[in-house]
Swiss-Prot record:
Pathway: Amino-acid biosynthesis; L-leucine biosynthesis; L-leucine from 3-methyl-2-oxobutanoate: step 2/4
Amino-acid positions noted as binding [4Fe-4S] cluster in the UniProt annotation, renumbered to this chain: 347, 407, 410
Native source species: Escherichia coli (strain K12)
Keywords of this entry: 4Fe-4S, Amino-acid biosynthesis, Branched-chain amino acid biosynthesis, Iron, Iron-sulfur, Leucine biosynthesis, Lyase, Metal-binding
GO cellular component, one term: cytosol
InterPro entries documented for this protein: 3-IsopropMal_deHydase_lsu, Acnase/IPM_dHydase_lsu_aba_1/3, Acoase/IPM_deHydtase_lsu_aba, Aconitase_4Fe-4S_BS, Aconitase_4Fe-4S_dom, IPM_dehydratase_rel_enz, IPMI_cat
The enzyme's E.C. designation: 4.2.1.33
Identification of the protein by name: 3-isopropylmalate dehydratase large subunit
NCBIfam families: leuC, PRK05478.1, PRK12466.1
Origin superkingdom: Bacteria
Family assignment from sequence similarity: Belongs to the aconitase/IPM isomerase family. LeuC type 1 subfamily.
Length: 466
């Protein structure tokens, strides 16, 4: 029987399945951070259980670390306790930890791929909703809750029901300057923020194949924002070239053998999906969200929509509420909306290609008066690479703040946050009410679009910036 990529990955990891029971899956990699793991380790301790496979468990600090100092006390009492607990737990249970002073420390979904922890064909879990990022490698990756974190630590398995399947095909080539962030925002604009609920999404089509691994990670990172369980891109030569030579990747003949298997991880000819969505890449322009969920998104050249234009009464009410929170009036051009802060970072857009794209816009320009702009590399290696290329100097000379790695302003769990009423052009993944700080107003954009907003003081079409 012809199978989708998701079905192949799922079936290959079933440890036990009985009639009327949820299948038990083997988990190849477990990524851990300071926020969702303390109670899980406490549970192990209470029952006298070890970590079943410490060699398949990797930990880092990211969510509530300071991006201005490596001092563990800098982000408040709760953050300090969580980070100290992680240090204690990893030491006690034999788990590798990339702490604040480790050169590999960074956002968990940046660290995993760049260290070769993430590989095609794997099942990967983490107590974090954006674990879907790793699906860019043709791995089945999804977020789990703290009780499930404990279960995986104890057994290296997890009960998981089968999801429905969705194919999202982006046909043709994207125009120059159109990024993976624009593509995925356009997709969510079409499906809505709940369009993928109950599904695992496979992204395909020429525009997807053209993306680098970093672009594919941006894409899969936001699969969760359309309600999907996970996102997938089938592995190909782009994938294999990225993985080769990384710290935890197979070496020599083992790598060749792995590639031979990874090449089978494609959806079979004739396999059927429960849902199919198609977009034309050439129609996608730079995207900016205007509301309070990622599906409320328009082209940078559009006007703020009028809630009355929505036929669905639920959508209409949602738009009215969103505009009130965002302090926007229907009909005004998006390019006239001024911003207060810019955040370039997060597990969506903090990799080296993202920073290069932002630096290209920032070079030779200055951050607009009254705007605070942060650039937060996703990991120690990304920061080192950017500095080797002189990107930090470009940003600093333009008036951006060059920070230490961490989740930063993506979420209000550390010192980087919005004040009430402040408007931010952000390369992160969520624009919910209060996500970046109580009363903060978030607009999701690509790194180049964020840099353009920083230097102009408002949203601007990067295609018009020479």
């Amino acid at each position: 029987m012809a199978k989708t990529l998701y079905e192949k990955l799922f079936d290959a990891h079933v440890v036990y399945e009985a009639e009327n029971e949820t299948p038990l899956l083997y988990i190849d990699r477990h990524l851990v951070h300071e926020v969702t793991s303390p109670q899980a380790f406490d549970g192990l301790r209470a029952h006298g259980r070890p970590v079943r496979q410490p060699g398949k468990t990797f930990a880092t600090m990211d969510h509530n670390v300071s991006t201005q100092t490596k001092d563990i006390n800098a982000c408040g009492e709760m953050a300090r306790i969580q980070m100290q607990e992680l240090i204690k737990n990893c030491k006690e249970f034999g788990v590798e930890l990339y702490d604040l002073n480790h050169p590999y420390q960074g956002i968990v979904h940046v660290m995993g791929p760049e260290q070769g922890v993430t590989l095609p064909g794997m099942t990967i879990v983490c107590g974090d909703s954006h674990t879907a990022t790793h699906g860019a490698f043709g791995a089945l990756a999804f977020g789990i809750g703290t009780s499930e974190v404990e279960h995986v630590l104890a057994t290296q398995t997890l009960k998981q029901g089968r999801a429905k399947t969705m194919k999202i095909e982006v046909q043709g080539k994207a125009a120059p300057g159109i990024t993976a962030k624009d593509i995925v925002l356009a997709i969510i604009g079409k499906t809505g923020s709940a369009g993928g609920t109950g599904h695992v999404v496979e992204f395909c089509g020429e525009a997807i194949r053209d993306l680098s691994m970093e672009g594919r990670m941006t894409l899969c990172n936001m699969a969760i924002e359309m309600g999907a369980k996970a996102g997938l891109v089938a592995p190909d030569e782009t994938t294999f070239n990225y993985v080769k030579g990384r710290l935890h990747a197979p070496k020599g003949k083992d790598f060749d053998d792995a590639v031979a298997y990874w090449k089978t991880l494609q959806t079979d000819e004739g396999a059927t999906f429960d849902t199919v969505v198609t977009l034309q890449a050439e129609e996608i322009s730079p995207q900016v969200t205007w509301g309070t969920n990622p599906g409320q998104v328009i082209s940078v050249n559009d006007n703020i929509p009028d809630p009355a234009s929505f036929a669905d009464p639920v959508e209409r009410a949602s738009a009215e509420k969103a505009l009130a929170y965002m302090g926007l009036k229907p009909g005004i051009p998006l390019t006239e909306v001024a911003i207060d802060k810019v955040f370039i970072g997060s597990c969506t857009n903090s990799r080296i290609e993202d920073l290069r794209a932002a630096a290209e816009i920032a070079k030779g320009r200055k951050v607009a008066p009254g705007v605070q702009a942060l650039v937060v590399p996703g990991s120690g290696p990304v920061k080192a690479q950017a500095e080797a290329e002189g990107l930090d100097k470009i940003f600093i000379e333009a008036g951006f703040e060059w920070r230490l790695p961490g989740c930063s302003m993506c979420l209000a769990m550390n010192n980087d946050r919005l004040n009430p009423g402040e408007r931010c052009a952000s390369t992160s993944n969520r624009n919910f009410e209060g996500r970046q700080g109580r009363g903060g107003r978030t607009h999701l954009v690509s790194p180049a679009m964020a840099a353009a907003a920083a230097v102009t003081g408002h949203f601007a079409d990067i295609r018009n910036i020479k």
